[in-house]
Amino acid sequence: MNDPLDLLKHFPPIADSDWQNLISKDLSWQTIEGINFQPYYRRGASNLQHLFDQNDWLICAQIQSTEILPALEDGAESLSLLIDQPTTLSKEMPVDKCPLYFRGKAVDTNLFYSLCDIVKSKGLDPSEFQGAVAFPEPIEPDFVFEIAQGTRLWTHEIDLCHWHDKGASLVQEIACAFAQLSDIMAQLKPGTSPNHLYLRIPIGERILLEIARLRALKIGISTILQSYQAPIHCLPFMGVSSLRHKTALDQDTHMIRTTLQYIAAIIGGCNVIVSSQNRNELMIQHILRNEGKLGIVSDAATGSWMIEHLTNALAEAGWALFQQIESLGGLQKARSWIESNIEQTHDQRSQSILSGEENIVGGNIFLADTFQNETPEGKSLIAPLDSIRLRTETIRYKGNLTVQGRCSPWLYRLINLCGLKMDDHQAMITVIETSDGYIARNSNDQQISFNHGAPLNVTAGRLMTLMESHAT
Amino acid sequence: MRPDFSSIPLIRRGITPNIDRSGSNLLRTCDHFDLESCEHLDYSAGLPPFLRGPYPSMYAERPWTIRQYAGFSTAEESNAFYLSAIAAGQCGISVAFDLPTHRGYDSDHSLVHGDVGQAGVAIDSIEDMHILFNHISLADMSVSMTMNGAVLPIMAFFIVAAQESGVMPQQLRGTIQNDILKEFMVRNTYIYPPQPSMRITGDIIQWCTENMPRFNPVSVSGYHMHEAGAPAAMELAYTLANGLEYVRTAIDRGLDIDSFAPRISFFFGIGMNYFIELSKLRAARILWARLIKPFEPKNPKSMALRMHCQTSGYSLTAQDPRNNIARTTLEALSAVCGQTQSLHTNALDEALALPSADTSRIARNTQLILQEETELTRAIDPWGGSYVVEYLTHTLTHHAWSYIQEIESIGGMTKAIASGLPKMRIEEEAAVKQANIDQGKEIIVGINSFQSKSSSEIRLLRVDNREVLANQSKRLSHLKQSRDSSKVEQALEHLRKCASQDNANLLDVALIAAKERATLGEISAALESVFGRYHAQHEPITGVYSATMETDECTVKAQSLSDEFAKLTGRRPRILIAKIGLDGHDRGARVIATAFADLGFDVDIGPLFQTPEDVARQAIENDVHITGISSLAGAHRTLIPELMNIFQRDGRSDIKVVVGGIIPNEDYPLLYHSGVVSIFGPGTVIAEAAQKIINQLLDHVSHP
Amino acid sequence: MSLIPDINSLAKGILSYDRGCLSRGITLIESGLSSDRDKAQLLLNKLLGHTNSALRIAVTGSPGVGKSSLIEKLGLHLTESGNRIAVLSIDPSSPNTGGSIMGDKTRMPQLAHHEDVFIRPSPSGNTQGGVTHATRSAMLLCEAAGYNPIIIETVGTGQGDYGVRHVVDFVLLLVLPHAGDELQGIKRGILEIADLIAVTKADGDMKSKSGIAAKSYQHALGMRTNKLSIPKVLITSAHDNSGISEVWESIQSLETDALHHGHFQQRRQQQIKDAILEATRSLLLSDFNGSEYRSLNDMQQKVVNSKSTVHEAARRLLNEYLQSQK
């Protein structure tokens, strides 16, 4: 019985209008980047862009110098060390085992030269050794490139985390990366190869956009380098985990995010991916490579109608913003302008998370019942909420609260956040719904009023104070 | 010179991809693939063949349903779990039943004491069903029940319990798995032989089509084939071929295709190979539409494949369980990018025991993060157009189609399963995969690479099943006292009569029995008296494991050790591989059997569902050196000590007992204390286990 | 290795129907160690007076024909009438790895569960075909343990099927309900030794086909020359449980007939003679194999260089062996 598959015979191609007719709502979507996207892209003009050929990446562990051996045993293929204090490098640095990346406030020429010495002392060729000695700001591009001449070391870091931690959107990060690159290239002697440059990029969990952003960066970087007539057209990417949504009081849940971030970093084409000191995070990389088979295909997103569209959209928007920065004279001159833009984005983002408009699982919704006494992650937008929850724990007092009237989802969230229980019988606090918000009263008749939708951490803080004064 | 960027546009280039072929069979020929020649590139979502999704707007209008499968030993505990899960964001209920229920036994049946309440909830009567759904409005909550063997009494209890709480059948939403063909193929929780089983399936499809328009009467499952070792194209082909068989069954009864086909749903497993798994789901939709089209449906929905997915349990490791969070995340991502309609994500300790509240929470959060924080719910089929995904979709579609044609040439799935072909194919793949893992060719983190030095500190959920047993027994005797026994007997007699003739819908008849408070065991036994209980017979495969292992050092050592043993004692080492209790998953046992035979052992395979007495008798009759018990479902804690006692009683404590499978660390002392000599957890290299066993035997020979 | 109690206890145990002792006795017999073989002979000696008491039946046929299913139904039928039966089945060992998989009990689960039944699967081991003195001796032990009849189940390919007729009173050959092409495929030889033929799986769609198949086999049997009577061809279905009692009745009438005409005893006597010769051959062979021969390598070279024939080389080797025995 041979029945051929013959798809087109049974199902003719579908026109755009056929699908459109089935849709009654506007399903387009916007993100904080301000770009409008469709839910759905189809085969159109050829948008096959294959942007990079490298398909595997170097697994990197960020460690203290005492943890070198365990990290290597756990399969780290490169090591990253933070040098924030003046340090003498030990002769036991494993320069023969893997690339080493040094970065931090105290990286200086001493460190650079002692590294080269160690390399030589182990009988290795310093011109072959891979790694980074990333000099801190302020940097003289000419100087760091000269010192590195003849080696393969990366000495100049373009750190997108700087913008990311200030609250930048993806478009802003892209634009700043372009602008920084342009500033650097402008300062270099013409014809100098920028092969000691690398980018350090924080990867978030909006997978499709993160993949697109990495590809968008490659397009723009290539354009800029070509415009400066540089001999190379691409730069290495070091991907690190974004800490913006780090839920310190829910580490296991956060591992889900970390996994998604690494996936985006791999598919988007990072050359190195850095895990923190946690062994689990290293294992995630091993699993994604060996079991998930990610990294076999280079630029797997090639041709994906959605991701190519996102790539182009982010690239165009980033480029347009970059052009604006250039017209203001470059990044150094336009710094305060772009930083105020970024601050607006930050405020918008922070507000939506702290009010509960945007859900962060384990951070402002679906909270864990019990948690360890962890330190909130400073760079996380969840930190204020984590602090409040820790405060509940430190006073060791989970009180009861009763609500008169409707308990809205926002109020429910607030109560959860404070670790309070709803119980009519032994309530210390009564919350009453008013026409424009709520009033909370304790049994000493002290009261506060707050609005619906206010930042949860602030309101929680006031509520906690109210409760604490009941206790005394 | 600083260029004037205001006049410089972005420079783009479009080049052909250079895809590295190493490591994945399916990607090997990608280089020569001409994307433009694909037939399916202009299909869309919501229109046949539904490549990009069964609905036009997919997640953009409504995200997939988070549906976590759970069963706690008693109906009360399960109910409590459902209520808290609903409060924590879950939108659908999924019920897991215990093995005695699956096989049609009441909890107080003599054969099942080790298995009651393990791996799922014990349902003996409609009263248990009432408790299960206490405070849950069945008119508002979608309920998915994984039941195949004892599907008649369970459906009957469900429908009548709903009616008694004021919800009519027309209002009920959800799914019953009711996929008996795959039971015969891989899962072994059938009760009756194939023909009467298919009749029951048909009766349920018909009854639901006529009375429960919002309920899916069958969930054609590929998950279990996936877990048994079937690669993607095979899982696709055999699942869809099963579905086709059910469609034909319904059509043969005179049902119109459009009256039931839109309610057929599917259930796939999601493994770790990210791009292949996501493409598999797309291929499934194309293939199903293609299979249904010849029935000339007027309603296009009849061709739309709707699916539930579950992340693969097989891919999880008991070692270093925290690693499983990443695995489940990747698999969930795959399912979501593949546009599944509902999803179950495994908890990180799912390989060890029933998930605890903490680990269930993380499992659920995986989906919640995907819904809330990734923007994936905005996009319809985001990977569409990707060179590698479209290549894989194309290849899997064609590959699966050829498997389907092969089944058709045998005469359809019922005949094919009777011939043993699909099961044999799957077993071969499983043996190959095991050999690859044992050799280290296929890397599993924590098992054959990057092993953790410390043991895991996970609090496991233990089921003290003696208490469950006692409670269920009490409840049963109370039920039997308070009901009208003559009416029950009447209903059961009526059931028997209708079973032996072909003139009534058995679900109709079972409803009456359920109302009168007949138990699950009584209903099943009534049918068994007419249909008989089925015992499957399967030819084991040989030579596949050893062929794949080739000249691996470990294998060679094991083989020479068994030769040495044969020379020394005059017999080859002889091992009985037995399955105790009601657990029907035999992939592991069968892989071990074929591997051991290839390593020079004489291997006796025991039938499924054996009691400790059965196993002991077999071991003694065959005079084996070792008895290997395979345990996946927790019954080992009671049944293995029983076995050891019987050996003692019969004077054969010289027969060594080893245990393999999912054994939590906490149980090791108990087992060793009862006399077990070795315990092999998942991830044990088979050739190493063989060496250990023979060395122990050799030791014993020199120092008896 | 089991802690085998002494031979006396074993013998006693077997005679008192102790399943464990019978099992260990069979293990002794199957063992390749010469010390075990000696012990096995001692054991047999002790039990000789209690043997020759059962009907011995072989059930043979190609893989997939349904031997186990039929044996299960037949066995259950027999136990219902109060018989205690033993089933010895032989599964092929891999020539490469030496191992084997024996899944017979999975195919006869109800029978395996029955109190009055003893089922022992055995690997064929190194012996070609596997049915040798070991099977014969195991059968004798089962008889001493009071089982009657004894059923030997073998795969009907290779020399095993020839071997089995030297050990049993009747050979039941099972065939599938396809006539025509399959018939050509069945080896001439196996048809020659069958005493009774049963078509299996005659259920459902196959019912009509089996009638036709039965007739074809009957016809083929009619062309045999060296049998006094032409065996019957029966139609059975394990699934429907049909034809099973007819099989047993046919066997019983064959037995009555053969006893009446003296063929039964003749056959057994011939078998004993054959068995003695076979055992002698086997001793000779193991003795021969146990030594090393200088001439082997020389002769091998000569034949390779076309300086001698294989036959001449064999003669030379035999001479060397005979010399070494002096």
PLM regions and their residue ranges:
Chain B
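Catalytic alpha/beta active-site cores
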Residues: 1-271, 295-298, 303-308, 336, ...
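Flexible, glycine-rich loop/tail regions that form catalytic "lids" or insertion modules at the edges
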Residues: 6-38, 44, 48, 99, ...
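Conserved, mostly hydrophobic/aromatic
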Residues: 61, 89, 125, 166, ...
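Short beta-strand/loop segments at the ligand-binding rim of alpha/beta enzyme cores
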Residues: 64, 303-307, 571-574, 650-659
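Short beta-alpha connecting loops at secondary-structure transitions
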Residues: 114-118, 182-192, 225-229, 268-273, ...
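Short glycine/threonine-rich loop-to-helix capping motif typified by GTGT followed
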Residues: 154-156, 229-237, 271-283, 311-325, ...
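Flexible glycine/proline-rich, aromatic-decorated loop/lid segments
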Residues: 259-260, 298-310, 318-351, 355-380, ...
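Cofactor-cradling patches in redox/metallo enzymes
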Residues: 589-699
